[in-house]
């Protein structure tokens, strides 16, 4: 059954916003409660004068390497990485894809040819929103660099280690010990990091469509808004650990 059109969207608008404002929104509202390294620009979605959505884009330390694997001649100012997305749960269906389409228009107007992003990482989210919004899929890698504290907060170990906050003797003990040293009691989340690319330039899209992979399906858990919904499908985690944070070690039960 098809859903009715979301009437809220007729009163919405998307505009660039300052990084200071985006950081405040992201660290308060996004499920990770963190600000991404290398953030370069941000966009707000406004409904009746209120900010009900935020997208942050920029350059992580691995952005260039991942882009150049697929587009070797593209220039730095022609690509960017979508790093954070938050949409208020008060907004109706299709709000995220609606905002994403308008952000892509703004990026296109500024000369961006290609956008990349990831799904999964701290959860077994295969990226349904990207699959429904014209993104292309380029596989996944095992991911064990997210740590879930006993308070339910997700922390990125790689970002923390980059600034020399972990003694060498702790580094030798592995991710679990590193997470405990940095953030207290918790568990490593063992999942996958899925790579999606949105080619804005038609020529790049035509070329990359020949290399794209089938979309992954049936995650153990997926994101709906800022909430995580158990799924009755097969778990897609890569070699799950006996204890893996909030991810179930067997297919989740609805």
What are these regions (language model features)?
Residues 13-16, 39, 58-186:
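Acyl-donor binding region in acyl/amide transferases
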Residues 26, 40-59:
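Conserved beta-hairpin
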Residues 208-254:
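Short, cationic low-complexity segments
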Residues 197-202:
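Short beta-strand-to-coil "C-cap" segments at the C-terminal boundary of structured domains/repeats
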Residues 8, 20, 51, 74-76, ...:
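A short, polar/charged loop/turn motif at coil->beta-strand junctions and beta-hairpin connectors
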Residues 1-40:
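Short amphipathic alpha-helix that is part of the acyltransferase structural core
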């Amino acid at each position: 059954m098809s859903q009715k059109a979301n009437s809220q969207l007729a009163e919405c608008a998307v505009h660039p916003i300052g990084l200071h404002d985006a950081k405040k929104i992201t660290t308060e509202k996004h499920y990770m409660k963190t600000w991404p390294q290398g953030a370069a620009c941000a966009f707000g979605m406004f409904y009746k004068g209120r900010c009900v959505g935020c997208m942050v884009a920029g350059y992580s330390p691995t952005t260039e390497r991942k882009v150049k694997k697929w587009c070797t001649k593209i220039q730095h100012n022609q690509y960017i990485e979508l790093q954070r997305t938050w949409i208020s749960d008060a907004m109706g269906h299709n709000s995220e894809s609606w905002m994403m389409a308008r952000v892509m228009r703004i990026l296109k107007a500024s000369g961006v040819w290609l956008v990349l992003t990831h799904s999964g990482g701290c959860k077994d989210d295969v990226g349904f929103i990207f699959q429904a919004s014209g993104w292309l899929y380029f596989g996944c890698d095992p991911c064990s660099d997210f740590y879930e504290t006993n308070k339910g907060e997700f922390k990125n170990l790689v970002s923390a280690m980059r600034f020399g906050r972990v003694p060498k003797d702790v580094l030798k003990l592995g991710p679990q010990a590193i997470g405990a040293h940095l953030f207290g009691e918790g568990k490593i989340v063992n999942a996958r990091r899925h790579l999606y690319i949105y080619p804005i330039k038609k020529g790049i899209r035509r070329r990359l469509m020949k290399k794209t992979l089938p979309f992954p399906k049936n995650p153990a858990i997926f994101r709906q808004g800022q909430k995580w919904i158990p799924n009755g499908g097969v778990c897609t985690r890569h070699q799950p650990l006996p204890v893996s944070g909030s991810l179930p070690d067997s297919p989740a039960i609805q």
